[in-house]
From Swiss-Prot:
Protein keywords: Cell inner membrane, Cell membrane, GTP-binding, Hydrolase, Membrane, Nucleotide-binding, Protein biosynthesis
Organism: Rickettsia conorii (strain ATCC VR-613 / Malish 7)
Main enzyme class: hydrolase
Reactions catalysed according to its record: GTP + H2O = GDP + phosphate + H(+)
Subcellular location: Cell inner membrane
Protein's name in the database: Elongation factor 4
Stored InterPro entries: EF-4, EFG_III/V, EFG_V-like, EFTu-like_2, G_TR_CS, LepA_C_sf, LepA_CTD, LepA_IV
Amino acid sequence: MNHQKYIRNFSIIAHIDHGKSTLADRLIEHCGGLQAREMSQQVLDSMDIEKERGITIKAQTVRLVYKAKDGNNYYLNLMDTPGHVDFAYEVSRSLAACEGSLLVVDSTQGVEAQTLANVYQAIENDHEIVLVLNKLDLPASEPEQVKQQIEDIIGIDTSEAVLISAKSGIGIDLVLEAIVNKLPPPKESSSDILKALLVDSWYDPYLGVVILVRVIDGYLRKNMRIKMMATNSVYTVENVGYFTPKKHISDVLHAGEIGFFTAAIKQVADCKVGDTITDEKKPCEQALPGFKPNLPVVFCGLYPTDSSEFEHLKDSLAKLRLNDASFEYEMESSSALGVGFRCGFLGLLHLEIIQERLSREFDLDLITTAPSVVYKIHMRDGENLEIHNPADLPDLQKIESMEEPWIKATIMVPDEFLGAVLSLCTEKRGMQLDHSYIANRAKIIYKLPLNEIVYDFYDRLKSCSKGYASFEWQMDVYEPSELVKLGILVNAEVVDALSTIVHRSRAEQRGRALCVRLKDLIPRQQIDIAIQASIGSRIIARETIKALRKDVLSKCYGGDISRKRKLLEKQKAGKKRMRQYGNIEIPQSAFIAALKIGDE
């Protein structure tokens, strides 16, 4: 392997749909990573969902060999990163493994909210940034205006920006030359003792866990005994290699390189992302600074529509967990829905993708309960609790105070839609922190409660701005709030699966909306059915499903009135008994429709 000065480790960062994965395809094609017949669109997006939705979920890596104009061969390690806010953690891991970044901006759309978030992360990691303006072939492309926008908002020098069209392949050689000439090589190795950063891990059915590493010092070779510093686990390396993007086995990974190894590790949970890997015999003294753990922020219950599918759901979740350590689940039961799982996600897109993968890859039909967030409860007896399931909320008399999570949201929107976006944020209990204009776009920063975001905020933001607004958020603080548990009763029976924790000011509106929706969904019976929304013992909304009238006199043609009276009295007694003991069956379809996110 050549000297470190011929290695370049870089990641591609951009907002969704600005052309990251297409640019990665062109770079692979240009450097001969795959033959023309093996190329497909979005080579690095391996999941079907990634290709269909046009998003990157898992960060992917590939090593390219490029012969530069100076006559030398350079080894380029490319990390393709996700652009969606839910997967910002994947971005932070990729950035920590690299020295430079390609910032891709769509020259027809300009700077978006997620572009900003990723750029600031790259700057925090001391990255050298090469600006790439994409989609130059489109008639709406305005490179000069976008350059000015970038200088105004981010403050990066745009005089050496590379203008390309990733789709048609224009300017790809300029990007490669910029990578070689402007991005720095890895720092010289300061020691021969192995020190490597664990960047990612995933499960392979034949090899066990495959671990992606960035070697900082020393080298990693086959049959070495290595130690994970966070867990002190010791393993023997079985295979070492890199991706081109095909898997390529080699003998050794040197300092500065990015590659993978396998070591007969059974579970992804044993490999903590951000951990330091070192030699068991000669361990390094100090571990690398890792990443802050990625904690789930949105929770919901997943239940099989058929209880016989429970074991299949359990196995399916375990398989998904092998490749997605940020996804958490635990068993729970509900009187209405049976046995299922309480699951934790990074955000709503993450929730949707897990749901879609369960139905598509494992053929499961699921009911999803209303999403909730983690609340902090301070009890009168001094105990502090963290809950995310409304069923776990203690009696309000025992609670001293409750805190809910708030987020800091950055929204970029064309100024003609600003009014609609501001009124949406105000409706969601938002507080405006900042408001500025860049050309004809407004950048607003709001503080918003997370439990208002998880319902339908993103969908409504897109619809009130005709799809032009972009949105990025990060957790901010927990603040005291007047929260209540909104319960739904059907025929005086509490339906636990429909319970939610809401702000007192929104309780009546949401309770009424749920009652109205259930009235349309639950089939009529022979008795009146009361659907009620309650806070504790107080009813705040009610709808009634009127009874079906069964005509018991239809077979009485004339005859004695006492005969008719006897039949009517019998029906009356039956209805009384039904009201007393009858359970109202709520069909699964009613649950699914009532719990639909975004139909508020």
